[in-house]
From Swiss-Prot:
It holds the Pfam family V-SNARE_C. SNARE required for targeting and fusion of ER-derived transport vesicles with the Golgi complex. GO terms for biological process: endoplasmic reticulum to Golgi vesicle-mediated transport; intracellular protein transport; vesicle fusion; vesicle fusion with Golgi apparatus. The modification N-acetylmethionine is found at M1. Coiled coil: none annotated. The chain crosses the membrane at residues 223-240. Belongs to the BOS1 family. Component of a SNARE complex consisting of SED5, BOS1, BET1 and SEC22 or YKT6. Interacts with YIF1 and YIP1. This is Protein transport protein BOS1. GO terms for molecular function: SNAP receptor activity; SNARE binding. Keywords: Acetylation, Endoplasmic reticulum, ER-Golgi transport, Golgi apparatus, Membrane, Protein transport, Transmembrane, Transmembrane helix, Transport. Residues 241-244 are vesicular.
């Protein structure tokens, strides 16, 4: 249980740092930061649930009437922190979306006002049409494929597509990292449980041969698990390499 609690504290500290970064740069924060916060929130929620399950199982095994106040306070604190982090991230995300919408609205409005107030805009437009007239006649097919968008708008749209793709890849990588950390942490917990079970079997008078056969079986299961994990990581690597 202490290992789970320490892991939850580590995730909580990471969330505090990421939320502080998001709050400090609420307008210019990258989308990948939001993905990282979402992944850490999911991992923390999973850890809190596992901690609660361990406490209930410990209570049933020891036939205790109530959970130790120390562990109960830890669970209550983690649950409250998770709720606060989720609410804060929701508010920051809403503020980020509102600022984005306001910036886009003011940007488009300002560009229209500048065009209408500029006395030379009409003459410049005519000159541009004269200069581009010959090229547009030769490039009708290209402009029709582009949906009539100006070149800079097309490039901006393409850049936004790439940014969204990179954000998704960063989110996938962050999820993979969190999953790997959870797997390593669970493996440590299982190793400790195995040692305790072996000591318990020796205390009960079970022969060393039986304990050795059980440990061999556990080792085979571990070997299969690690091979599957390595194959999974290799598969994720090639998928990401293909997507990039």
């Amino acid at each position: 249980m202490n290992a789970l609690y320490n892991h939850a504290v580590k995730q909580k500290n990471q969330l505090q740092q990421e939320l502080a970064r998001f709050e400090k740069n609420s307008v210019t924060a990258p989308i990948s930061l939001q993905g990282s916060i979402s992944a850490t929130l999911v991992s923390l929620e999973k850890t809190v649930k596992q901690y609660a399950e361990h406490l209930n199982r410990y209570k049933e095994d020891t036939n205790a009437e109530e959970i130790d106040p120390k562990f109960a306070n830890r669970l209550a604190t983690l649950t409250q922190d998770l709720h606060d982090f989720t609410a804060k991230f929701k508010d920051l995300k809403q503020s980020y979306n509102e600022n984005n919408s306001r910036t886009q609205l003011f940007g488009s409005g300002a560009s229209h006002v500048m065009d209408s107030d500029n006395p030379f805009s009409t003459s410049e437009t005519i000159m541009n049409k004269r200069n581009v007239g010959g090229a547009s006649a030769n490039g009708k097919e290209g402009s029709s494929n582009g949906g009539g968008l100006p070149l800079y708008q097309g490039l901006q749209k393409e850049q936004s597509v790439f940014e969204r793709g990179n954000a998704q890849l960063d989110y996938i990588l962050e999820m993979g990292q969190q999953s790997f950390e959870n797997i390593v942490e669970q493996n440590k917990i299982l190793s400790k449980v195995q040692d305790r079970m072996s000591n318990g079997l020796r205390t009960l008078g079970v022969s060393e041969q039986t304990i050795t056969s059980i440990n061999k079986r556990v080792f085979k299961d571990k070997l299969v698990f690690w091979i599957a994990l390595i194959l999974l990581i290799i598969g994720i690597y090639y998928v990401l390499k293909w997507l990039r």
